Amino acid sequence: MTAVLDAWAALAFLRGEPAASRVKELILAEEALISSINLGEALYWTERRLGQRQAREEVDRLRPVLVVEDPDWPLVGVAAHLKAGGGLSYADAFCVATAQRHDATLYTGDPEILALDVPVEMVDLRAIS
């Protein structure tokens, strides 16, 4: 099984939120994949909270334990199509497109993503307490 994480999941892990335990399980099982776009989103949110240097240190500790996938042109096309449909950010479109590409389960707590009608299995991390 492959698990795709979005920025919401990465941030939950970095902040030690309740869903962090589930994200950690996925990482330890070597099943976790994240788009570099979504990891970048987690980086900028962390920088807003902690500053640039500390944010880089936090996210850099996460990078080696995840498979970080850079988008290629076909994936950009899928993400652009998802974004054109409305209802989600461009960065969010990349985690959905990445999950579609890998026929993977998407782990998120983002209500905009969870509300999508797309052929991707999703796990709502907000339900974990």
Give names to the regions the model predicted.
Residues 67-109:
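Active-site neighborhoods of divalent-metal-dependent phosphate/nucleic-acid chemistry enzymes
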Residues 96-129:
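Acidic, PIN/NYN-like endoribonuclease modules and their adjacent C-terminal/linker elements
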Residues 31, 67, 119-121:
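Conserved beta-strand segments of alpha/beta enzyme cores
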Residues 5-6, 34-36, 88-89, 110, ...:
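Histidine- and aromatic-rich ligand-binding microenvironments
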Residues 24, 43-44, 63, 80:
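Amphipathic alpha-helical segments within well-ordered protein domains
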Residues 9-10, 38, 75, 95, ...:
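Alpha-helix capping/helix-boundary segments
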Residues 1-34, 47-60, 129:
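Short, well-structured N-terminal submotif of metal-dependent ribonuclease cores
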Residues 23-30, 62-63, 99, 113-117:
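Alpha-helix C-terminal capping segments
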